[in-house]
Amino acid sequence: MSLKQQVDLLPNKPGCYLFFNKDNDVIYVGKAKNLKKRVSTYFNKAYNIKTTRLVREITDLKYFIVDNEKESLLLEKNLIKKYHPKYNVLLNDDKTYPYIIITNQKDPMYKYVRKYDKKALKNYGPLPIGSNARSILLTLQRLFPLRMCQGNLNKPCLYYHLNQCSGACFKQVDPSYYEYQIKQVDKFFKGEINQVKQTLVKQMQKASDNLQFEQAQRIKDQITSLDFITAKQNVDIVTNKNIDVVNYEINQDKICFVILFYRLGQLTYKDEYIQNYEGQNLSELFNSYLQQIYQKNIYPDVLLIPNEIELLDLDQNLLEFSSYSLNKQDDVFIKLAKQNAIDSLNKSVISHNVNSGDEIEILEQLKQISNASKYLKRIEVFDISNIYSQFITGACIVYINAKPIRNEFRKYNIDPSYTSDFSRMKFMLEKRFLKQIKEKEQLPDLVIVDGGIIQIHAAKEVLNKLNLKIDVIGLSKDDHHKTRYLIDIFEQTIDIKNFKKLYNFLTSLQIRVDEYAKSGFRKKYHNQLNDQILLIKGVGKKTNLKLYKHFKTIDNIKNASFDELNKVINNKKITNLIISNLNK
């Protein structure tokens, strides 16, 4: 029976399905509320444009009908565990996060665990990245003692004498004692730790005065761990809820999932997972990723997911706390998770291409496609980044034999008076090549500009002026801001998507030079935040950013009239404050 006939005969019932390849290996396991409807999408011509390798590999399929959602979830989990299909999400079995728990016992105690404990009285976590979880545990044991020993010793234990045990070792402890201590621990993890820090600072000072320097250092480590718990976030969050945010990014043939854990308004943990993407059903992959995450980790109050993921495709137990973005704060969460996924995937692409082992083949193909005149041993790539035409930074990255030479990477400050892409690129390249000529440095065999014809013409003008015979090509992106086209030395546009190794290599160049340039303007921007305007008491970052977005430079702000400034700020008091301070 042909594959199409098998699909046509599938029942309109819930169940699990398995795809097999020519070697009879299971390559994908999925579940569906309607088997026929779901499996048919893989063989639909419109959908099949995206499915590529996965669908091409399918030679056979099998299915199981189930009675309910819970049964299909369990069956899918067991089938994935049994066959390890290469196109499924396969998180490591040890994909767990650090927690501190309080045991659910008559005389509870603290424990550090690497897995959410459903039986525990309290689970605190995942704990912040960079924090020393065991140091936090030690702090809790010392400041809010619970049971520390095995109990029922008929005599006080050593920890009781050190004020680190409730005394369950030799007496009945009033339950109200534990209730009070646990309330203090709750406050502690909500960030109310000023009193705790004061106590620790006093203990550290006392240990230091008594020349107990090792003890003082241990206490200092505890204070550092507390700072991680209450570290100020880049996003101001007002919530008492535990929120997890999941998003994804697809780039070339890879997909990256990122999950951000917010606990009581603090970002405490981030995790990522990258695997091959060959057109698998996105909602299924997303659902499978979430299932595996929450098999061993605590459910949040809210799980935020991107709008394009269908909630109906999620399992019932995930549906109960899953949500799309409902307000501006949710939008910030979703965008932040998206940016993390993009960054993680970009780093993965760069890392993969640094060690690809196909350098000679890639360079030969690049020479051929770009019509370059000689072997491309040394390549220099140029890009420019800015924000609101301010903090303009040019960047040059250098590759020799297709390997990055980081100590030759350079950044160039570009004055805002250069207002066009052409003039900025021309300024940077002129500065670059004049120095190389003067100091007799090695010149590139190929110049690649991140951009189109405008940037290419700027580069050619500089090279002609300096009488340098160096080939110039450009890299441009598609409507989704992904690397797509190469503009060769004759200014012909070539789609490079199908030249996979070359495409991956050029994508990694474009990502790296873009990130390197952005790191320059970010530094300038953060330095600028300490400028004259922000030093004015009562003027914040938002006002500062509005002014620079509109006026571009501090000189333009100083020369603006009251009406011009107030039109941007829309606050007469602040406008007067700025004018009076800048005119001092």
Curated annotation (Swiss-Prot):
Residue spans crossing the bilayer: none
Source organism phylogeny: Bacteria, Bacillati, Mycoplasmatota, Mollicutes, Mycoplasmataceae
Example of a GO MF term: excinuclease ABC activity
Keywords: Cytoplasm, DNA damage, DNA excision, DNA repair, Excision nuclease, SOS response
GO cellular component, one term: cytoplasm
Coiled coil: none
InterPro entries: GIY-YIG_endonuc, GIY-YIG_endonuc_sf, GIY-YIG_UvrC_Cho, RuvA_2-like, UVR_dom, UVR_dom_sf, UvrABC_protein_C, UvrC
Quaternary structure, from the entry: Interacts with UvrB in an incision complex.
A Pfam match: GIY-YIG
Occurrences of domain UVR (ranges): 194-229
Family: Belongs to the UvrC family.
The protein's role, per its UniProt record: The UvrABC repair system catalyzes the recognition and processing of DNA lesions. UvrC both incises the 5' and 3' sides of the lesion. The N-terminal half is responsible for the 3' incision and the C-terminal half is responsible for the 5' incision.
Domain annotation GIY-YIG: ranges: 12-89
Top-level taxon in the UniProt lineage: Bacteria
Organism of provenance: Mycoplasma mycoides subsp. mycoides SC (strain CCUG 32753 / NCTC 10114 / PG1)
Keyword DNA repair: yes
GO biological process: nucleotide-excision repair; SOS response
Protein name, entry field: UvrABC system protein C
Subcellular location, record wording: Cytoplasm
DNA damage keyword on record: yes
